[in-house]
Amino acid sequence: MSGYILCQTKRAKLPYFIENISTNVYSIEELCYYLYHNLYLIDQTIMNEGLCSWIQEELELPALAAKLRSKISKFASAEDIVYPVFKEINYLTYEELNVRLQKMNEETPAMREKQKADALMENEMYVHAIQVYQNLLEREDLEEIREGMTEKVYHNLGCAYSYLFQMEKATEYFRKAY
């Protein structure tokens, strides 16, 4: 996947607000871009009835909204929920999505949580990232999962606190990292 994607569908007058990164999306293409680049952040706060209503009313895609409603009500897997959105505009093939999701599913729950926190950091959601990193540090099996994981979490906590200009806490975590 390279280059650019030309918007082929209607642009919404009212955006859909993605709460966990405080971002508005105005089109199905923007939604696909967000989902593709933030797979670790996909949860019930995004894939819910509000999204289905927005897709139906603002984007005027009632068939897609109906598909998503049925998947969400059955508590389907992320793959089953996300794929119809990608398929609507041929953003990804099933195989491309499956490769990304399979890689994600092979990771341990702790590693997925770290990836989630890292994604929050990339989106400048430092307070949420700090919460996820703190929860990771409470796990007793963190070092067993991957050597050096604890130090990386401490380092990332230091970075998060430094972005929030809490230099004393940042220094504390940087020291723990090394």
State what each model feature region is.
Residues 1-112:
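Long, contiguous interaction/recruitment modules in multidomain scaffold/adaptor proteins
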Residues 100-104, 138-148:
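Flexible helix-coil transition and linker loops at the boundaries of alpha-helical arrays
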